[in-house]
């Protein structure tokens, strides 16, 4: 609802002042169409009283490994599916053991390709391995769709997003693209139509108002509802920072 969206925008602005670096907003996300049991920290919730668990993977490195040695898109797809399914089998076996020991309900795996802040563990790097000259240029949407379509074809017990995470503050290559002006919030919103989690850890100027954040969240919600997919937003106004500051 619009009141809920506006409330989220106001919370993001207020939370930005709770810590000097503005990182309190790492622990708050606006959710749109997100189901229960998604193992994504700020969006996770349960719909029942019984203890449950799910596993989320920072699996950008699997994509980089799969794409680095692939000569064609078909080979890249096959390699990534193979990597995901091989790792899923190992994780599911361990999770099922834990389920039997502790009687917690195992909901599944979220293989959303999430990065770690190193170039060799960057989802932006994985996208460029598919032939992009730079993330944010034309072709990024198609490359993003290729990855999420590949994830859809892998076979494992699913929960959560199982898509593509593009967190600017947590990804070396995406951060470089944003700093160089080739990757903007409008681009990330466009990619959300084919990706996974939406707008994640996007730094904003410290003086960004709730009135400026509100329409961004409104657009994200419209995408989530129109496309019937889960999306989230973690937007971080950075105290004392302006556009272009480091």
Predicted regions located by residue number:
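Anaerobic metallocofactor- and corrinoid-dependent redox/one-carbon enzyme cores
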Residues: 1-246
